[in-house]
Regions:
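N-terminal pre-triad scaffold of radical SAM enzymes
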Residues: 2-29
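Short, flexible active-site-adjacent loop segments at beta-strand->alpha-helix junctions, enriched
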Residues: 27, 107, 129
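Residues embedded in well-ordered beta-strands within globular domains across many folds
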Residues: 70, 124-127
Length: 130
């Protein structure tokens, strides 16, 4: 999985102060999309174990209390992104007690496959559709 941008402190993409990750890869081509640069799967930077560690550390940093994380893009539920997103979400659930997880996707809930639904079962809010 690649990502375009990571904001360790964000007050725009969801409630409260939070972390936000914009991943690469989207097939929806929504009219008016403000993140067209994230559509190509191979754009951006590789999502590494170090980046995953950074996100978990930022979520647990007591100096800046964060309500949770927003996962956007691109599309976090693009089939090629789901394995890494699922791994990240599971780790946040294990290691970041009380943090909420919001996911934005161009898919509608009834279009999701089993692996995408596994992600949805672990998050707090899904903003779905085009």
């Amino acid at each position: 999985m690649n990502y375009h941008q990571y904001y360790p402190v964000d007050i725009v993409n969801g409630p409260g102060t939070r972390c936000t990750l914009f991943v690469s890869g989207c097939v929806h081509e929504c009219p008016g999309c403000y993140n067209k640069s994230t559509w190509r799967l191979n754009s951006g930077m590789p999502f590494t174990a170090e980046m995953e560690d950074r996100i978990v550390n930022d979520l647990n940093d007591s100096r800046i209390k964060r309500q949770g994380i927003s996962l956007s893009g691109g599309d976090p539920l693009h089939p090629q992104n789901v394995p890494e997103i699922l791994k990240l979400v599971k780790r946040i659930r294990r290691e970041c007690a009380g943090k909420d997880i919001w996911v934005w996707t161009g898919y509608k809930l009834d279009e999701l496959n089993a692996q995408q639904r596994e992600v949805v079962d672990l998050i707090n809010v899904l903003v779905d559709g085009k």
